[in-house]
Regions:
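Rhodanese-like catalytic fold shared by cysteine-dependent sulfurtransferases
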Residues: 353-364, 368-405, 413-444, 450-499
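Short hydrophobic core segments
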Residues: 39-49, 92, 170-180, 244, ...
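Mid-to-C-terminal Rossmann-like scaffold of FAD/NAD(P)H-dependent oxidoreductases
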Residues: 220-333, 364-368, 372-398, 405
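A Rossmann-like FAD-binding core segment of flavoenzymes
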Residues: 11-28, 32, 39, 107-205
Length: 499
């Protein structure tokens, strides 16, 4: 038993109902018989976690509406499904819980719709990278209703009506709320502890609260973001476990410090893996940082070895200093190990250009001689040296209409015919030297290819011949995925449906 091994007395079916810091006691209620008694403490650790955000919508609380936080919540949902055999579900919220639940319900054969206030799923990712997640969800039959506001619910004989602001309502046999979590800090507030963001518990780097001899850890505490130093709420199991160890060490006379949360996370999205660490481009700019990014599409392992899969990587770094700030990776193989390398690099304070120098394990079944992380480093190093100048998706509208620039697509004729951007002239990279006279001198040349590699080669050829060039970050593959996704979202937003 737990007590026999660790000499820790576990009291299940008991609830702490109040904390008395002045007497160093807690009031405890036995949930089986209603008895209330006092327990003394020398040191008190609070780890109440977070509770599902409960919006004050009409209809919250009806029988066919669920929240998902605990194992017991899972049992309730599963019991309802096994008993009632629902054919459809609406999930309000597009974060980790929403996506994981959507996949599981879809595997049961249910029609699943996700409603999200933002125009993207998975807020830790930038909107452009989230497009890859949207595409995977749609590919597996998940309906996305992005940019919509839920206003309430009505119970019907045949299910639930989900009321949307200024749009037709949705119908489903069941609804699950997965719109985020809120620190569960009622006890802490009543005990007079200092509270921070969303009434989370404020702690120092020793995980001590504002009240002596009371510590706190987990989803209920406010932490410092490791990259920005700003106060943050980061509800992840990894940081919570580390915080618990630090508290135990300090209670036992040690002096351990929590350095902050980096937000490293990974999620399975059907056959795909999506992972992130540090801060994304959106939040970096909100923090007032001057940033740049590289977007690349490397293979998960050597291309000549069977089974390799393309992944999409976005690495965020600070201009001038080239401080590594964050990364996002989406793909079907090898995503998790690359994000872990980048998370380690950020924690170690590596300069983004130093990624090129990392000595990473290589064999054809597992990687390439230049690992995807190395490739990101080479690209950033080229930017630092002035060898590579980029242009980005947000520049497309302006650049594509500029009469004082030259637009060249260096993919093959076949690739170009399958889809291209208006205004671009097709000169395949292998014909570039012979056709260089077709490119007007004296004007900047903006290049694009499928992934960014051939357009980089073209830029080196043209730069060697006296041209000023800019390479499109991410290539046509990235552009096509993002633009098509945005078109689907906007069309759905205008029409009221994404299906």
């Amino acid at each position: 038993s737990f007590f026999k091994r660790f000499r820790i007395n576990m009291k299940i079916h008991h609830e702490v109902i109040s904390i008395h810091p002045e007497s160093k006691t807690v009031s405890v209620k036995n949930l089986e018989n209603g008895e209330i008694f006092e327990e003394n403490y020398d040191k008190l650790i609070l780890s109440p976690g977070a509770k599902p955000t409960q919006p004050r919508f009409p209809g919250v609380g009806i029988d066919k509406l669920f929240t998902l936080r605990t194992v017991e919540d899972t049992f309730r949902i599963k019991e309802y499904i096994n008993k009632n055999h629902p054919k459809s579900a609406v999930l309000a919220g597009g974060g980790f819980i929403g996506l994981e639940l959507a996949e599981n319900l879809r595997e049961l054969g249910m029609d699943v719709t996700i409603v999200q206030l933002l125009k993207q799923l998975m807020n830790p990712f930038d909107p452009d990278m989230a497009s890859m997640i949207h595409n995977e969800m749609r590919k597996h039959g998940i309906k996305l209703v992005l940019g919509y506001t839920v206003e309430g619910f009505k119970e019907k004989d045949d299910g639930v009506e989900v009321l949307l602001k200024d749009n037709p309502s949705l119908q489903a046999d069941m609804v699950v709320l997965a719109i985020g979590v809120t620190p569960d800090t009622v006890l802490a507030k009543e005990a007079g502890l200092e509270l921070g963001i969303k009434e989370s518990i404020v702690v120092n780097d020793r995980m001590e609260t504002s009240v002596p001899d009371i510590y706190a850890a987990g989803d209920a505490v406010q932490v410092k973001h490791y990259v920005t130093g700003n106060d943050a709420l980061i509800s992840l199991a990894g940081p919570a476990n580390k915080q618990g160890r630090i508290i135990a060490d300090n209670i036992c006379g040690g002096d351990s410090r929590y350095l902050g949360s980096q937000g490293s996370s990974v999620i399975k999205v059907f056959d795909m893996t999506a992972a992130t660490t540090g801060i994304n481009e959106t939040n970096a700019k909100k923090s007032g940082l001057e940033v740049d990014t590289v977007i690349l599409s490397p293979m998960s392992h050597a291309g000549y070895y069977p089974g390799g899969k393309v992944m999409t990587m976005k690495v965020v770094f600070e201009k001038e200093s080239y401080r590594l700030l964050g990364a996002q990776i989406i793909g079907y193989e090898g995503v998790d190990k690359r994000i872990d390398v980048l998370a380690t690099a950020i924690h170690a304070g590596l300069n983004a250009t130093q990624l090129k120098d990392l000595d990473l394990a290589y064999a054809p079944p597992y990687s390439s001689a230049k690992d995807p992380v190395n490739m990101a480093g080479f690209m950033i190093d080229n930017i630092a040296k002035g060898t590579l100048k980029q242009w980005h998706l947000e520049d497309m509208d302006k650049i594509s209409k500029d009469k004082d620039v030259v637009l060249i697509d260096v993919r093959t004729v076949c690739e170009f015919s399958r889809g291209h951007i208006d205004g671009f002239k097709n000169i395949p990279v292998d014909e570039l030297r012979e056709r260089i006279s077709e490119i007007e001198k004296g004007k900047p040349v903006y290049l694009i290819c499928q992934s960014g590699l051939r357009s980089y080669i073209a830029s080196r050829i043209l730069e060697g011949n006296g041209y000023e060039t800019y390479n499109f970050s991410g290539g046509f593959r990235f552009y096509d995925a993002v633009v098509n996704d945005r078109a689907l979202i906007e069309r759905a937003y205008a029409c009221g449906m994404d299906y």
